[in-house]
Swiss-Prot record:
Belongs to the shikimate dehydrogenase family. It catalyses: L-quinate + NAD(+) = 3-dehydroquinate + NADH + H(+); L-quinate + NADP(+) = 3-dehydroquinate + NADPH + H(+); shikimate + NADP(+) = 3-dehydroshikimate + NADPH + H(+); shikimate + NAD(+) = 3-dehydroshikimate + NADH + H(+). The keyword NADP applies. Its EC number is 1.1.1.282. GO terms for biological process: amino acid biosynthetic process; aromatic amino acid family biosynthetic process; chorismate biosynthetic process; shikimate metabolic process. GO terms for molecular function: quinate 3-dehydrogenase (NAD+) activity; quinate 3-dehydrogenase (NADP+) activity; shikimate 3-dehydrogenase (NAD+) activity; shikimate 3-dehydrogenase (NADP+) activity. It comes from Escherichia coli O1:K1 / APEC. Substrate binds at residues 71, 107. This is Quinate/shikimate dehydrogenase.
């Protein structure tokens, strides 16, 4: 790829960032489509995020992806949020239109799309959702919008717990889905929720390096063959949770599905063009 002075810059702001496959995936897609953009990753934490957004405007960047730990904070630095992003309370995509910043969340649509592409119909189903960060709440919100009957959200009593309660209230007030929030330390409630669940989704970083030997499911007998287990983590590709699920006879969806579909939507938001899906799946080895 020969970058010229006509190229526009798209970023990814997160910390840590060096594990991300998004720059490789997006640049392969941009090159295949012959579009004058280049995508770069920047290590940006909460403290440096405000300055990074000012830099985005000053450099007239086309936009940026936003990942941990900035997804919720980023909502405060855009001029407009989509209705779904307001429901989530977090964004993973910023589009810069001549200094006017629009915030989107493609995590939820990407993950739910991956589930649908597997042939699973979420309408009327119950999901056990682990975590209350930006990715997890995006998945929950989009699932509620698209027909989930119930979401049982489990999170530790950490800094995200009150945010989880606020998220549940927003979804309960604006959709037909019923969301409850329970402390993950209540293992009896967790076991009962899994017994009646159709989907278990990990929206936390547990399972991602350096936590690759950990899972929030402490007892594999809680997983049953009728359960669909989905993962947001893609590094490593096969997390401990997915290994447990396969041993228990569950159908599984790895983190590549969400990465691919959320990235495809981001690509279109930034460029206005279709994402070369099959090409990217092939060159990135997704689904192989």
């Amino acid at each position: 790829m020969d970058v010229t002075a006509k190229y526009e810059l798209i970023g990814l702001m997160a910390y840590p960032i060096r594990h991300s496959l998004s720059p490789e995936m997006q640049n392969k897609a941009l090159e295949k489509a012959g579009l004058p953009f280049t995508y770069m990753a920047f290590e940006v934490d909460n403290d440096s995020f405000p300055a990074a957004i000012e830099g985005l405007k000053a450099l007239k960047m086309r936009g940026t992806g936003v990942s941990m730990p900035n997804k919720q904070l980023a909502c405060e630095y855009v001029d407009e949020l989509t209705p779904a992003a307001k429901l989530v309370g977090a964004i993973n995509t910023i589009v810069n239109d001549d200094g006017y910043l629009r915030g989107y969340n493609t995590d939820g649509t990407g993950h739910i799309r991956a589930i649908k592409e597997s042939g699973f119909d979420i309408k009327g189903k119950t999901m056990v959702l682990l975590g209350a960060g930006g990715a997890s709440t995006a998945i929950g919100a989009q699932g509620a919008i698209e027909g989930l009957k119930e979401i049982k959200l489990f999170n530790r009593r950490d800094e995200f717990f009150d945010k989880a309660l606020a998220f549940a209230q927003r979804v309960n007030e604006n959709t037909d889905c019923v969301v409850t929030v329970t402390d993950l330390a209540d293992q009896q409630a967790f076991a009962e929720a899994l017994a009646s669940a159709d989907i278990l989704t990990n929206g936390t970083k547990v399972g991602m390096k350096p936590l690759e030997n950990e899972s929030l499911v402490n007892d594999i007998s809680l997983l049953h063959p009728g359960l669909l287990v989905t993962e947001c983590v893609y590094n490593p590709h096969m997390t401990k949770l997915l290994q447990q699920a396969q041993q228990a006879g569950c159908k599984t969806i790895d983190g590549y599905g969400m990465l691919l579909w959320q990235g495809a939507e981001q690509f279109t938001l930034w460029t206005g063009k279709d994402f070369p899906l099959e090409y990217v799946k092939q060159v990135m080895g997704f689904g192989a």
